[in-house]
Amino acid sequence: MSKECIFCGKKPQVGNLVSHSNIKTKRRFNPNLQRVRHQFADGSVRTLTVCTRCLRSGVVTKPLVRKQG
């Protein structure tokens, strides 16, 4: 799974982990990415890696779930 949002391009960032004695070591801040089925304008459906901000803002259009039988 890629660590980048398909729509906004959000990816991991580098920062510092700061201890009580103010010693700094490098760490990574990973975005909250989810794998979601997305329906495109032509009707095709693909599974994409999307951040939760894009999910909440309505960028992703989920396909209709049809009942069997």
Swiss-Prot record:
Name the UniProt record assigns to this protein: Large ribosomal subunit protein bL28
Keywords attached to this entry: Ribonucleoprotein, Ribosomal protein
GO MF assignments: structural constituent of ribosome
Family according to the record: Belongs to the bacterial ribosomal protein bL28 family.
SUPFAM superfamilies, alphabetized: L28p-like
Organism for this UniProt entry: Desulfovibrio desulfuricans (strain ATCC 27774 / DSM 6949 / MB)
Keyword Ribosomal protein: yes
Keyword Ribosomal protein: yes
One Pfam family matching this protein: Ribosomal_L28
GO CC annotation terms, alphabetical: ribonucleoprotein complex; ribosome
Biological process annotations from GO: translation
Origin: domain of life: Bacteria
